[in-house]
Amino acid sequence: MRSRWSRSYIRVVNYHNTDKVDADRFEREIASFAEHFTSVSMEDIDRFFKTRKWDKDKPGLIPAVFEGFRNGYDVMLPILEKYGFKAWYYIPSFFMDIPVKEQLRFTEHYDLTVYRPEDYPDGRYAMTWDEVREVAKHHEICCHTGNHFQIGRETPDYDMYREIVVAKRVLEEKIGRPVDVFCWLYGEEYAYNPRAHKYLKEAGYRYVVSNLKIEKIG
């Protein structure tokens, strides 16, 4: 996200799968990020929107780890911790509660691509809630709907409520802290779906993320 207000900026790098086979590449990338950028916390975002300035010596960068996959914990988290670099984890909050034997079917139904199922022969592809809580100790937890569900202009209200409001409540109850950020599927902007905005406000989100920007919910 390039700042409209200064020459400083925040970049976002998306990770939708962090398979073991690519661990060396991920480490090289995070090591480079740690050298050339600074990580971004919610407090940094709050200050950025309040002051209209990025006040760090280095530009900001958010590694965005999507979908709540187990490899986001097993593979990516140790690398992030090694370099002390904060990531934002975008969690479809109902995924964690799907029984192990049904998780692959769930991923196929909701367009959560498992590229290397052989990495986890036990069939568990989602993080456990204990693992999500471990991630939450040093990283930001954001809501990516409940079921990895695309919310469109014609989506019924009960689906919007479940995927926006209930999904946030589940995350907050499980990790024991507020969840302030909602991320649309497939990068739609905040203005894409005005009908959904009342649910974002009702739920108490403060920011919404698209492929193009981070927007403050007014």
PLM feature spans:
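C-terminal active-site subregion of NodB/CE4 polysaccharide deacetylases
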Residues: 1-64, 70, 156-218
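Metal-dependent polysaccharide deacetylase catalytic core of the NodB/CE4 family, i.e.
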Residues: 13-16, 58-61, 81-190, 214
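A short, Lys/Arg-enriched amphipathic alpha-helix followed by its capping loop at the start of a domain
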Residues: 28-36, 79-83, 138
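Short active-site segment of divalent metal-dependent hydrolases/proteases
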Residues: 69-70, 147
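Short alpha-helical segments and helix-capping/turn motifs at coil-helix boundaries
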Residues: 72-75
